Design a protein with these regions (language model features):
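Accessory beta-strand-rich segments of carbohydrate-active enzymes
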Residues: 48-51, 98, 117-236, 263-264, ...
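An acidic-aromatic loop/edge-strand motif
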Residues: 99-104, 108-118, 169-170, 180, ...
């Protein structure tokens, strides 16, 4: 957890009356926790407006009959609510999703670019209604309701009165606040009702592109928290702390600001007092009736905001993500009118173009190589805090430092947690829908785009984890739109770099983007990343790319593919691939069959798929690591999936890590020894900021039958944040077609700090560059011959376990001793931690290592930590299997 310091601000004012009901745009409730606040997460009911004949004035009155309505929670979408209450069957199982009402939209283009199909129940608006008791303590207060996420447009009613019209209340990423004071009934029942319409094809909504099917309601609903707040006459909004580091990156100056809104009909005079480490500063404030004023504390005026020894926020891979907290108070005498809290970090992010034109980022004066993945929320945008915790813990466990958000700019919980965990976030608009169809924009579209940009900039500017904003995705906006976005960012005092798009396309306004999105997205062999010099290879900053499909582990496949469709691969499998060009796993499967030999069963296919995923992800991240800072960043497409998927993830929908997860984890070791597929060299990549002297690299080559053919050891020093070549791997005599390479890195004291294991072929993968047609993938001319792996003798490992799980503990640990007693390689050893009650992995689970290989006679201890709540009070079952490993349960050590 991060450390914190508290800054307090107090504003004194006179008590006055409140104005009539009005909507305030761009006032994020989540950024200002008021003195009195309730969240309306429960008590919601929804129904199609085609089924409700009553007008909004009646729907929003207490006692309105809602028999037959669907109960739900918020955040949610219409389809999400109908799935939750079992109106619809599990859409993630088999092909249930495509049988939902409204799924008859065309597959020729993205659903976001289509009108709702005829007969869809989601052509109608849907009512979202909540009847709740307003706290008695809210009496005499200024009461507001906050909607930071409505998809897409809404008529809003409260206690029988319309307070918002769909002509104004529209935009997935806009933030709305309504003053309810004159209509609210403190201590009694109140009703809020929204008549929500799904986004049309010209609306700036959200789309799932080709990741997975788009739900038939286009995620219509309330997708962020709804809160009701009570305050005095003056409201505090948009608190912001901006830091400026001195060139020594030790001292820092802070500027604290907030918008003060006088909701009364009388002038308010007061003073703002700020405290920092026992020091206080003060300035007078006067607000005319209805006035909003930005109050600022500048360090030149208030020396208390000049910190000589600032504690900096760092990405967790570099240092501690230290967080400060500022508390703002507005008081009338001894009575608090409103409060606000803002958590922030002191850090400075800059970017520049290298001599080759590639964008490189620095934080607090240190360059860093971006190694990240793209995150996806739940398909129905439901809040899943435990799953989010697991997602972010997995990010850190693998060694990734960045998460990208293409649209779906999530709830504040997401950014609060990335701040605390020191994980960088790269948000921006989405591609492939109205967001990039600028030629079709109307004045209203432009207004929504501008308001969305302003709201999100104000919301995210305090979060130290957010280090850049992409205001274009697959391409940059035209000059007039780009200038509009840049003006809005400037007005919001956006503290970080912004980039015109995720692609390499330049603009006339800002020039080169310095990034690229040149793929691939389909399967490519490990050699691709170092061999390619024109597309997705390891140079520049690749904002989205992937070695292709990622088949979930067998136990997970059984959870979403019906038993009669599990083998051979059929259309049910393909339905869980992607969209557009990614509707099958055929390219991946062809490579699997040609490199590893034809799969003979689901189990055979799955073990080979895990080996491919491990090798593919490791090769991609290792290539970008070896080439730093010719390569400046890479974003794996993707981290996770919004539903059970066969493509683009590092762990599956059920949170089970597979081969790709552990290939990534291996590649991202802080001090790492690795092999290069392009020139058969061995390098050491140092991702720390300390020089490492007196290291030794050992490389051993083994034949398929585990005979040692070559053993080489060299000394080397490794500079900080650098990659150094250690040696070349020659091909010795007697090499089998399929062979193995084991690498070890030891420090000055002889301690093993990194090891790596490769399965290679004397027949290399070769790419057919002439047949490359687009950025999706590059076809192969020849395939490596790894079929020898099928003839590896079965190995029964010696194994024992020690479990540390005290009664009542929420976190358990286990240590597993493994030994290969045979004369053969134990290849791709997989350990599982499962519940005895269910044949499912207990997740999230954090293995030191997995999908590893053991030399003949080699012994290793592997540790794991896990969440005990999945085990129903029992100890876990530890299981071992692998490519040529006899499956067994691991017994207790004696």
């Amino acid at each position: 957890m991060s450390s914190r310091i508290t800054v307090s601000l107090v504003l004194a004012a006179a008590s006055v009356f409140l104005p009539a009901v009005q909507a305030q745009e761009g006032a994020p409730a989540a950024a200002s926790a008021s003195a009195h606040s309730i969240e309306l997460s429960h008590g919601w009911e929804i129904q199609s407006s085609c089924e409700v004949k009553a007008a909004g004035a009646d729907v929003s009155k207490s006692g309105f009959a809602t028999a037959g309505w669907h109960k739900t929670t918020v955040p949610n979408t219409v389809v999400g609510a109908l799935v939750d209450d079992k109106t619809y069957p599990d859409p993630f199982y088999g092909t249930n999703m495509k049988n939902l009402p409204g799924m008859n939209y065309s597959s020729a283009t993205f659903f976001a670019n289509q009108d709702m199909p005829e007969g869809s129940p989601f052509r109608c608006a849907w009512w979202w209604r909540n009847e709740f008791v307003m706290p008695a303590a809210f009496a005499g207060k200024n009461i507001a309701i906050h909607f930071p996420g409505i998809n897409y447009r809404a008529n809003v009613w409260f206690n029988g009165q319309k307070i918002g019209d769909a002509q104004d209340i529209r935009g997935t990423y806009r933030i709305f606040e309504f003053n309810l004071t004159q209509l609210a009934k403190a201590g009694a029942k109140n009703v809020i009702a929204l008549e929500i319409t799904a986004p049309g094809k010209q609306d700036l909504g959200l789309t799932w592109v080709d990741w997975n099917p788009t739900p038939p309601d286009k995620d219509m609903g309330i997708w962020k928290e709804v809160t009701v707040t009570a305050a005095g006459p003056v409201a505090i909004r948009n608190p912001f702390v901006k830091s400026r580091l001195h060139r020594d990156f030790t001292a820092a100056d802070l500027t604290i600001s907030a918008d003060l809104r006088n909701d009364s009909k009388t002038t308010v005079k007061g003073s703002v007092v700020a405290e920092l480490d026992g020091k206080s500063v003060k300035q007078a404030v006067e607000l005319a009736a209805g006035e909003t004023k930005t109050v600022r504390f500048e360090p030149e005026q208030f020396p208390a905001l000049q910190l000589a020894q600032a504690k900096l926020w760092w990405p967790y891979t570099i240092g501690t993500p230290y967080l400060y907290k500022a508390n703002l108070h507005f008081s009338a005498g001894n009575e608090v009118s409103d409060t606000a809290t803002v958590t922030f970090g002191i850090r400075e992010v800059t970017s520049e173009l290298t001599d080759q034109g590639y964008r490189v980022f620095s934080i607090n004066g240190r360059r860093f190589l971006i190694r990240g993945a793209a995150w996806a929320p739940d398909m129905f945008l439901r809040p899943m805090s435990k799953k989010l915790d697991a997602d972010l813990r997995y990010v850190r466990h693998m060694g990734l430092n960045t998460v990208r958000l293409e649209g779906r700019i999530d709830r504040d919980e997401f950014f609060n947690k990335t701040d605390e965990l020191g994980i960088l976030v790269m948000p921006g608009w989405t591609c492939c829908d109205a967001w990039e169809q600028w030629k079709d924009w109307t004045d209203e579209t432009r207004k929504v785009a501008a308001a969305s940009m302003a709201d999100q900039a104000r919301r995210l500017r305090n979060h130290p984890s957010v280090f850049v904003w992409l205001y274009g995705s697959d391409g940059p906006p035209p000059a007039d739109v780009e200038k509009m976005y840049l003006s809005i960012l400037s007005e919001a005092e956006w503290p970080d770099p912004s980039v015109s798009s995720a692609s390499e396309a330049p603009t006339t306004v800002t020039g080169k983007s310095g990034v690229k999105m040149t793929g691939p997205y389909e399967y490519v062999p490990p050699v691709y990343w170092l061999a390619d010099k024109q597309a997705g290879g390891a140079y520049g900053y690749n904002t989205e790319t992937s070695p292709g499909p990622a088949i979930p582990v067998l136990e997970s496949v059984k959870r979403f593919i019906p038993s009669d469709h599990r083998w051979p691969i059929d259309d049910v499998w393909n339905y869980h691939a992607g969209g557009e060009r990614f509707t099958t796993v055929n390219v991946f499967t062809d490579a699997l069959n040609r490199r590893y030999g034809p799969a003979t069963s689901l189990a055979d296919y799955e073990r080979k798929a895990q080996a491919i995923a491990y090798d593919g992800e490791r090769a991609m991240f290792e290539a970008y690591g070896r080439n730093k800072y010719t390569s400046t960043g890479v974003i794996q497409w993707m981290l996770n999936n919004a539903w059970p998927s066969l493509i683009w993830h590092l762990y599956d929908y059920y949170l089970v890590p597979g081969g790709g997860y552990f290939g990534t984890k291996k590649a991202l070791e802080p001090l790492h020894v690795q092999y290069a597929y392009d020139d058969q060299s061995v390098s050491v990549v140092n991702s720390t900021y300390q020089e490492r002297k007196g290291m030794k690299v050992r490389a051993r080559v083994y034949s398929l039958d585990a005979k040692l053919l070559q053993d080489t050891e060299v000394p080397l020093d490794v500079p900080a944040d650098a990659a150094v070549k250690a040696l070349d791997v020659a091909k010795p005599d007697g090499l089998t077609t399929t062979y193995f390479l084991r690498l070890d890195l030891r420090d000055l004291r002889g301690r093993l700090v990194s090891h790596n294991f490769y399965w290679l072929s004397t027949k290399p993968d070769t790419l057919d560059w002439a047949k490359k047609q687009d950025t999706v993938y590059t076809p192969q001319a020849e395939f490596a011959d790894l079929t020898g792996l099928n003839s590896l003798p079965a190995v029964r490992l010696e194994a024992s376990r020690v479990i540390e799980q005290p009664p009542g503990a929420t976190l358990g640990k286990a240590h597993i001793r493994l030994k290969n007693p045979s004369s053969s390689m134990a290849f791709q050893v997989r350990l599982r931690l499962a519940s005895r009650k269910e044949d499912r992995d207990a997740v999230p689970v954090f293995w030191d290592d997995n999908y590893f290989s053991l030399l003949p006679g080699e012994e290793r201890i592997v540790s794991v930590s896990y969440d005990t709540s999945q085990l129903h009070g029992a100890e876990p079952v530890i299981l071992v299997d692998g490519f040529n490993i006899t499956s067994a349960e691991v017994g207790a050590a004696h």
